[in-house]
Amino acid sequence: MSSIYRTVSRKEKPRRHHGLTTQKKQEIKEAFELFDTDGSGTIDAKELNVAMRALGFEMTEEQINKMIADVDKDGSGAIDFDEFVHMMTAKIGERDTKEELTKAFQIIDLDKNGKISPDDIKRMAKDLGENFTDAEIREMVEEADRDRDGEVNMDEFMRMMRRTAYGGN
């Protein structure tokens, strides 16, 4: 199932560099400077939470602490500008991935009912020159269909694609 989705995603849109735009880099720099309120050159957990909100990310205290721990090389409990840029690049990449998966879902959902049905997969596979049996298509749907309604909704699709792409849940 995942090979069909990856093929569709690649056909629809050429691969693009996931670097940050100049505007995004500037926004990150401004956010860092704005929220480094004491001018120390680092951002602590409280400052990071405010910065993340300003950039459009709502996060729990636990998520903020984990973000700091993931990039805090010296164990100071705060992050410097380079660590902040690295962390924000990853967060923005996650958001881009969700947008790409949403587009892929919409392409595969041929009847535009908000769910991917076995018929959608069969027609898409045929358009791509793939030949799957009904049993193979049913197995693909069952792999992702958590609510067991016989179709794959957006949440199920996202979960399955993330599991496929990242080897986890």
UniProtKB/Swiss-Prot annotation:
Record: residues binding Ca(2+) 3: 109, 111, 113, 115, 120
Key words, A-Z: Calcium, Metal-binding, Repeat
Positions of region (Disordered): 1-23
Cellular component GO terms held in the UniProt record: cytoplasm; cytosol; plasma membrane
SUPFAM superfamilies registered for this protein in UniProt: EF-hand
Signal peptide: none
One GO-annotated biological process of the protein: abscisic acid-activated signaling pathway involved in stomatal movement
Transmembrane spans: none
Nucleotide-binding recorded as keyword: no
Highest taxon of the lineage: Eukaryota
Upregulating conditions: By wounding and infection by the bacterial pathogens X.campestris and P.syringae.
PROSITE patterns: EF_HAND_1 (PS00018), EF_HAND_2 (PS50222)
Protein name: Probable calcium-binding protein CML20
Gene name of the encoded protein: CML20
